[in-house]
Amino acid sequence: MASVVLIGTQWGDEGKGKVTDFLAEKADLVVRYQGGNNAGHTVVAKGEEFKLHLIPSGILYEDKTCVIGNGVVVDPKVLLEELAYLSERKVKTGKLLISSNAHVIMPYHRLLDALEEDSRGEHKIGTTKRGIGPAYMDKTLRIGIRIMDLIDDEEFAAKLRRNLQEKNNLLTKVYGVEPLDYDAIYQEYSGYAQKIRGLVADSSLVIDESLKAGEKVLFEGAQGTLLDLDHGTYPYVTSSHPIAGGACTGAGVGPTRINRVVGVIKAYTTRVGEGPFPTELADETGELMRQNGHEFGTTTGRARRCGWFDAVIARYAVRVSGISDFALMKLDVLSGFEKIKICVGYRVNNEVIYEFPQSQKIFKACEPVYEVIEGWQEDITGVTRFEDLPKAAQDYVRRIEQLTETQVTLIAVGPGREQTIVRGEIF
């Protein structure tokens, strides 16, 4: 038995898709445990680029089984579109299973998400308007429609009718928009149910049987630590738990079954949407990072905000998820910078703090305290051994290890599978 949880350690967009794809080669089962199609991951395989939002990255291996766990909220329309997209690209995909306990994103979730965000005015939280938050709200309120309900005609009809009555009251009386039509939604989603029925399974049981058989299981998180509902930069967070602990509840597996936690971390820092960002660079340096790193959202296309590496955030991620290894991404993007900065602490109210603050009011007031180290000019995209990196690049990696007390086991020097420096085994 071997199981690894793969998480994002910043605000998402760290490059988890590439690492999942890289590690999936040795895994038997790849499990997505939270989030929905608000998260995008890009994978480059055999020179081809694939952009996915809901289906686990491991689907590109035809001998793997991929699982969408109970902690995921599933938009069946998007799911079927992604399967069609892979088919059109003539990809021989692996087996896909969907948890019967996963909740379904309905049309009213998407509509309410957009209406609520627009009503916030200057207090917007940066939602993708894909219905993720409202779907999780219904789950918490215990009125949500699960995959098992969707494929049961009688259950689906009854639950849809009850939900739509409530949601249409909200839409017409609070937001002043037209009500949604029951028959249209029922017909549309019944069609989806027929197409996904054969994929539905007790995912927790599938995972348990795989682990008992001695197989290797990779749990794939979406978003990142600082978007976690409890441990992120609230309220600028997602509605689920991207941290390692989320794998247990979102996949139905006990914590003693987890062997390692790999934190995917970018060699610099990015953020999409609203919220404080101490190391953000609103200058030519930040723009150069954005262009060199192609920092535009997979899901929204929005330009990502860019800044220097923040070791305070990295240490915090290690603490809340028990990270055993880092996968350091996009080291090649920093080639060409004469000097490179690392944030080692925050200055706030004439005091320097070295731990991530719980208060967003304090975090918003934080100014970065930097260490400045030498950069490197060499192109490192073809380097395959750590020892062959420029000395300055090696020193940069070692300094991150020192500041976080965590080993950097994988280093990405380009988007391809083969552009990965391996310094130790994960599985």
Swiss-Prot record:
Known cofactor(s): Mg(2+)
Q: Please list the residues that bind Mg(2+).
A: D13, G40
A Pfam family (short name) is Adenylsucc_synt
- What PROSITE patterns does this protein map onto? ADENYLOSUCCIN_SYN_1, ADENYLOSUCCIN_SYN_2
Tell me the domain of life. Answer: Bacteria
Could you give the cofactor binding note from the entry?
Binds 1 Mg(2+) ion per subunit.
Annotated localization: Cytoplasm
InterPro entries of this UniProt entry? Answer: Adenylosuccin_syn_GTP-bd, Adenylosuccin_syn_Lys_AS, Adenylosuccinate_synth_dom1, Adenylosuccinate_synth_dom2, Adenylosuccinate_synth_dom3, Adenylosuccinate_synthetase, P-loop_NTPase
Where along this sequence does the record place binding of IMP?
D13, E14, G15, K16, N38, A39, G40, H41, T128, R142, Q223, T238, R302
The UniProt annotation places substrate binding at T298, T299, T300, G301, R302, A303, R304
EC number(s) given by UniProt: 6.3.4.4
Q: What is its main location?
A: cytoplasm
CC terms in the record's Gene Ontology section: cytoplasm
Q: Does the keyword Ligase apply?
A: yes
* Catalytic class of the enzyme: ligase
* Keyword Nucleotide-binding among record annotations: yes
Pathway, per record: Purine metabolism; AMP biosynthesis via de novo pathway; AMP from IMP: step 1/2
The residues that the entry says bind GTP are: 12-18, 40-42, 304, 330-332, 412-414
Q: Name one GO biological process term.
A: IMP metabolic process
Q: What is the reaction catalyzed? A: IMP + L-aspartate + GTP = N(6)-(1,2-dicarboxyethyl)-AMP + GDP + phosphate + 2 H(+)
The entry lists its GO molecular-function terms as: adenylosuccinate synthase activity; GTP binding; magnesium ion binding
Q: What does this protein do?
A: Plays an important role in the de novo pathway of purine nucleotide biosynthesis. Catalyzes the first committed step in the biosynthesis of AMP from IMP.
Complex formation: Homodimer.
Family, per entry: Belongs to the adenylosuccinate synthetase family.
- HAMAP family referenced in this protein's UniProt entry, alphabetically: Adenylosucc_synth
Give the protein's recorded name.
Adenylosuccinate synthetase
Q: Which gene encodes it?
A: purA
